[in-house]
């Protein structure tokens, strides 16, 4: 025995140990095969088709026996064995067997997503549909059910919309109501007024003295709406310069109050107040003067159609506050014959007869005349045949002067005078 070589002893499992009972190496000898570093050359092509093992014999399946309708697969011998014995049930799910299909290796795709499913399909598309339908959706449903058990669904509380408090329609509470609500409330409030209230004389048309007239503390739109909600009278208060584009400057209050307090009340559209040193600035073309009527005011683009909707009342100017309180006669639907005609026969200036004409603002008025009536031009405005003399008033025509009862509580109404032929 050569030196350095240890004696070895083999047991029943063909494992050898040293004499000193010290484990040297474990080796399992197979007859006809020798272990070693030997290079093996593989001849052929690699097959990528998966290999499945039968659940009964634990051998790789070469030919599949696919059971219908449960779609479980075994080796063909085991599947036929259970069929021949007479069990007629699937050995995996104990489902009744209708028939057994025979398929070769590589033509069957088995589900391995969930442990224990092992259903087989003949195409990859069918397998993916099965996984999506049976496994992915089931997981989502189970997850949602578990979340509902852990955290049950609580319905959100019903939010109750608080009712808008009913504000008083005075000057102190107008800032709580938007302009849209004023427009909606003005129509029923004016329609519910009796006809007797329209013809009552208005005592609030008098211009206050200069020392008692306060400056307007509220914006223009609030002042306009506050007159809509009044019970007596169909007045509309509008700011003269409510548009920033108008170039006319508002004069100081002391210059105009003595002038207009002493002027008489206009009772006919053919009459024009005597002009003295100062004149009222004409309304800007972009924002014409709104005239009183029992309906909401019209748009800016139609100034000539407004005058046919209100009874005949007076016109008073309050220039310290920047307002015009106007009451339009009811017979402005058709031009009265007292209005002089122009050279071309048009009578458009009769619609503007109740305005104060100011020659100082003629340039500004004619520059923006596109927004007004096209017949109102500079030549027509300066024509002495159209406008009366600046000093003195011509005697009013007896046929067209309205009776005093119409101006102060008469029995004539706006709807009666509107359709009378002239």
UniProtKB/Swiss-Prot annotation:
E.C. number(s) listed in UniProt: 2.3.2.27
One Pfam assignment: zf_Hakai
HYB domain: annotated segments: 93-151
Top EC group: transferase
Pathway: Protein modification; protein ubiquitination
Record flagged with keyword Methyltransferase: no
A Gene Ontology BP annotation from the UniProt entry: protein ubiquitination
Function summary: E3 ubiquitin ligase catalyzing the covalent attachment of ubiquitin moieties onto substrate proteins. May operate on tyrosine-phosphorylated SRC substrates.
Protein name per its UniProtKB record: E3 ubiquitin-protein ligase CBLL2
Native source organism of the sequence: Macaca fascicularis (Crab-eating macaque)
Gene: CBLL2
């Amino acid at each position: 025995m050569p030196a350095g070589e240890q004696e070895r002893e083999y047991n029943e499992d063909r494992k050898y140990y040293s004499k000193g009972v010290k484990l040297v190496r474990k080796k399992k000898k197979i007859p006809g095969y020798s272990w070693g570093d030997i290079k093996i050359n593989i001849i052929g092509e690699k097959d990528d088709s998966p290999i499945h093992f039968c659940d009964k014999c634990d051998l790789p399946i070469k030919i599949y026996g696919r059971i219908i309708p449960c779609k479980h697969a075994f080796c063909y011998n085991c599947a036929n064995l259970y069929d021949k014995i007479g069990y007629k049930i699937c050995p995996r799910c104990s489902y009744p067997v209708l028939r057994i299909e025979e398929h070769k290796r590589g033509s069957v795709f088995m589900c391995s997503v969930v442990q224990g499913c092992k259903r087989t399909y003949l195409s990859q598309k069918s397998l993916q549909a099965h996984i999506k339908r049976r496994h992915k959706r089931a997981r989502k449903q189970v997850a949602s059910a578990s979340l509902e058990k852990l955290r049950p669904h609580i319905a959100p509380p019903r939010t109750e919309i608080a009712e808008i408090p009913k504000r008083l329609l005075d000057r102190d509470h107008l800032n709580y109501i938007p302009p849209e609500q004023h427009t909606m409330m003005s129509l029923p409030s004016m329609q519910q007024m009796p006809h007797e209230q329209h013809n009552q004389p208005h005592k609030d048309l008098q211009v206050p003295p200069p020392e008692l007239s306060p400056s307007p503390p509220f914006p223009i739109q609030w002042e306009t709406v506050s007159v809509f909600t009044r019970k007596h009278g169909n007045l509309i208060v509008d700011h003269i310069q409510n548009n920033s584009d108008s170039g006319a400057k508002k004069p100081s209050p002391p210059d105009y109050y003595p002038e207009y307090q002493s002027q008489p009340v206009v009772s006919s559209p053919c009459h024009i107040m005597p002009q003295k040193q100062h004149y009222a600035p004409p309304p800007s073309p972009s924002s014409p003067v709104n005239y009183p009527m029992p309906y909401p005011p019209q748009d800016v683009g139609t100034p000539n159609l407004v005058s046919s909707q209100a009874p005949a009342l007076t016109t008073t100017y309050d220039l310290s506050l920047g307002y015009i309180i106007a009451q339009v006669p009811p017979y402005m639907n058709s031009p009265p014959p007292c209005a002089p005609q122009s050279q071309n026969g048009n009578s458009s200036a009769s619609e503007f007869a109740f305005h104060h004409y100011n020659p100082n603002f003629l340039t500004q008025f004619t520059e923006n005349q596109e927004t007004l009536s096209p017949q109102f031009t500079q030549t027509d405005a300066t024509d002495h045949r159209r406008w009366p003399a600046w000093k003195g008033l011509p005697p009013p025509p007896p046929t067209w002067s309205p009776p005093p009862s119409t101006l102060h509580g008469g029995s004539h109404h706006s709807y009666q005078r509107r359709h009378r032929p002239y």
